[in-house]
Amino acid sequence: MKQDSRFPNLFITDHPLIQHKLTHMRDKDTSTRTFRELLREITLLMGYEITRNLPITTKRVETPLVEVDAPVIAGKKLAIVPVLRAGIGMSDGLLDLVPSARVGHIGVYRADDHRPVEYLVRLPDLEDRIFILCDPMVATGYSAVHAVDVLKRRNVPAANIMFVALVAAPEGVQVFQDAHPDVKLFVASLDSHLNEHAYIVPGLGDAGDRLFGTKN
């Protein structure tokens, strides 16, 4: 895990396996099926990193040999909230890691001015819960900011929110940091820039279209 001095709340997971799989996702000739599988695999691998600091307590269990106080995650419950639609492709990878997590959904689409338009919010109970928001791309940053806004408006503490993405543009990370400097943003790659159409360069194209095999 490394950081960029420009963005104090940004954490980049530079594990070789993650970078290898991300390269294959970037390839324009990668099939929809393979793209989908790689997205799930990368998200699972990133999940190990982003859950590294979950609070731990002990539980008394009986092994076949003895009783022992063994570590378990303390108190707080997990919720996975994909930002629709591309975020759906990441939720399965996180559920592979934490199958007991609750799942919510935040639906937004990008208007002509690139601002997010909300069309759906479905969340589990909020009390004493850690939320992992997921979306493959942080391009302009507006959708990511909006997703965090949804939780903060419902009084979810910033310390209980994490946002995980595959690739991000510096412009979007700056927007996210300006709006939510108290929320950690985890990515696999900080790419070069946004082009005139607000696509991340080099990026991996439209993650939703590549995930579902549709055309914009």
UniProtKB/Swiss-Prot annotation:
Please state what class of enzyme this protein is.
Answer: transferase
GO terms assigned for molecular function: GTP binding; magnesium ion binding; uracil phosphoribosyltransferase activity
- SS bond partners: none
Its EC number is 2.4.2.9
Q: Where is the signal peptide?
A: none
A Pfam family it matches: UPRTase
Q: Which InterPro entries match?
A: PRibTrfase_dom (IPR000836), PRTase-like (IPR029057), Upp_B (IPR034332), UPRTase/APRTase (IPR050054), Ura_phspho_trans (IPR005765)
Pathway annotation from the record? Pyrimidine metabolism; UMP biosynthesis via salvage pathway; UMP from uracil: step 1/1
CDD domains found in the cross-reference section = PRTases_typeI
Catalysed reactions, semicolon-separated: UMP + diphosphate = 5-phospho-alpha-D-ribose 1-diphosphate + uracil
Q: Provide the residue positions that the database annotates as binding 5-phospho-alpha-D-ribose 1-diphosphate.
A: R85, R110, D135, P136, M137, V138, A139, T140, G141, Y142, S143, D206
According to the record, the protein's activity is controlled as follows:
Allosterically activated by GTP.
Cofactor field: Mg(2+)
Cofactor note (record):
Binds 1 Mg(2+) ion per subunit. The magnesium is bound as Mg-PRPP.
Question: Record-annotated residues binding uracil?
Answer: I200, G205, D206, A207
Question: What are the recorded Gene Ontology BP terms?
Answer: UMP salvage; uracil salvage
| Sorted UniProt keywords | Allosteric enzyme, Glycosyltransferase, GTP-binding, Magnesium, Nucleotide-binding, Transferase
Task: Name the PANTHER family for this protein.
Answer: ADENINE PHOSPHORIBOSYLTRANSFERASE, URACIL PHOSPHORIBOSYLTRANSFERASE, CHLOROPLASTIC
Described function = Catalyzes the conversion of uracil and 5-phospho-alpha-D-ribose 1-diphosphate (PRPP) to UMP and diphosphate.
Q: Report the family membership.
A: Belongs to the UPRTase family.
The name on file for this protein is Uracil phosphoribosyltransferase
Q: What is the lineage of its organism?
A: Bacteria, Pseudomonadati, Pseudomonadota, Betaproteobacteria, Burkholderiales
